[in-house]
């Protein structure tokens, strides 16, 4: 189902000056995530930040595409691409956003930590991905609370034309035995059962928004019918007990990253960090 705007039942409207949610707004955000598995926070980030990140990722794209093995998620045109981790492009309002952490701490606990700093590029002419989840249910067939929340940052206006993601609200709680294949893709019979009850939605997402979603939410990348790449920055917050490799960050940001109570699972290194040819253990879509 294609919509003209983010649906009201999934959305909170904010401004870049909002540093905390009042109790009523926090309760609403948590209720949206619990019921639907996806929350759209519009107006969160200043466009001067997203503009710089977008430009840097687009500048890197030719080098990514020259690699012998381009990191592709499922089908052609969906390229996993990490953003630069230079000090000048690591923004506290993005990496340590107080409203984002207020929400993820409320769901995952005060020791939750970000362990992903990645992204993707949906290229013109891309194919349709299979419906999938990014993170598995830990105990198949058993209902359990979330252990991770994906934090997605559109770096341009996402439109129906340029490949705004398809989401399946409420699917994060669906955990029957044998629902998924070995890649985390939803089996066709399960898709049709869910479609009859709650069909998927797609909608424009304005730049400056942040999308928080349960890592188990069904979703897929769709074809980019525009003439320009569609970049996304992606992070994932996990409960402190879930083991993940650390993000590689330059030691020049250690003081403000490590000094924050908004935790980042990071390894700090001297000099430049190779963000283009390192391992890509996460299938961020």
UniProtKB/Swiss-Prot annotation:
- The EC number of this protein is 1.14.11.37
Q: Could you say which protein family the record assigns here?
A: Belongs to the PhyH family.
A Gene Ontology BP annotation from the UniProt entry = kanamycin biosynthetic process
The organism's lineage is: Bacteria, Bacillati, Actinomycetota, Actinomycetes, Kitasatosporales
The cross-references to Gene3D superfamilies, in alphabetical order and at most eight, read: q2cbj1_9rhob like domain
Q: Which cofactor does it need?
A: Fe cation
Please state what the protein is called. Answer: Kanamycin B dioxygenase
Any idea which UniProt keywords this protein has? Antibiotic biosynthesis, Iron, Oxidoreductase
Task: State the Pfam families in the record.
Answer: PhyH (PF05721)
Superkingdom is Bacteria
Q: Which InterPro entries match?
A: Fungal_Metabolite_Diox, Phytyl_CoA_dOase-like
Class in the EC hierarchy, top level: oxidoreductase
Q: Which GO terms describe its molecular function?
A: 2-oxoglutarate-dependent dioxygenase activity
Fetch the PANTHER family from UniProt. PHYTANOYL-COA DIOXYGENASE FAMILY PROTEIN (AFU_ORTHOLOGUE AFUA_2G03330)
State which pathway it belongs to: Antibiotic biosynthesis; kanamycin biosynthesis
Whose protein is this, by species? Streptomyces kanamyceticus
Q: Which reaction does it catalyse?
A: kanamycin B + 2-oxoglutarate + O2 = 2'-dehydrokanamycin A + succinate + NH4(+) + CO2
